[in-house]
Regions:
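A structural signal for multi-pass alpha-helical bundles of membrane permease subunits
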Residues: 1-228
Length: 228
């Protein structure tokens, strides 16, 4: 759930940090801050969130001090799923931002200067120049984020005590696979592994083809014009 806002905010931050006209201060500090969660172990991050959002945690203490009732984040479907998505977002959007920044910084500045001279706005430059050029990098980040989401295990495992509560609505495919391995049901675990591989491969190919479709079409048109 978290990789969609992750891509949006990462792309937004990457465009801000690489825009020299904004003259943002302390960009190095902010880059370090947004990347820091990526360096924290997922298990430690999960325990931190478990403590903060527990029934007697700081968040509920704050709600009680404001006269609001205790909200059982880990006992509600929306609460548990929302926390997992938030943790996944915080842990990985910094890495995605750095990757997208590298792609944007690799664009020839002369192209953008020429577009500005021709009267293009910043939004037009971003939509017509930046996005098409970094599409391969976006495809890479989307595919890796998709695979990471399918393979998610440690965060929901720790946050829900391995049960995927409430009512197994937070149980991931890898948690289900791990339960079969733990119970020595190797046949079911092997079948599930193959199914996960097929699903991952199909979705990855679909995302990559969809994102890079315009590039292939443009290349084909250019090739036809060259032959003529």
């Amino acid at each position: 759930m978290g990789f969609i806002p992750q891509m949006f905010f990462s792309l937004l931050l990457a465009s801000w940090f690489t825009d020299l006209r904004l003259r943002l201060k302390c960009t190095g500090f902010f880059k370090t801050v947004i990347y820091m969660p990526n360096l924290i172990m997922a298990s430690a991050f999960s325990m931190l969130f478990y403590t903060i959002f527990s029934d007697a945690g700081p968040i509920n203490n704050l709600l009680n001090s404001m006269g609001l009732p205790t909200y059982r984040f880990l006992a509600e479907v929306a609460g548990a799923r929302g926390l997992i998505a938030l943790m996944n977002f915080l842990m990985w959007f910094g890495n995605t931002t750095i990757v997208l920044m590298a792609g944007i910084m690799g664009i020839d500045t002369g192209i953008m200067e020429a577009a500005r001279i021709d009267g293009a706005s910043s939004f037009q430059i971003f939509r017509k120049i930046t996005l098409p050029i970094i599409k391969p990098i976006m495809a890479y980040t989307l595919v890796t984020s998709l695979i990471g989401g399918i393979q998610m295990f440690d965060v929901p495992q720790i946050l829900t005590n391995g049960n995927g509560n409430p009512d197994r609505t937070s149980m991931t495919a890898i948690m289900y696979l791990n339960k079969h391995l733990y119970s020595k049901n190797y046949g079911m675990a092997g079948a599930l592994s193959v199914i996960l591989f097929i699903i991952t491969a199909v979705l990855s190919i679909f995302v990559f083809k969809y994102v890079t479709k315009d590039m292939v079409d443009t290349g084909a048109k250019t090739s036809k014009k060259a032959k003529k």
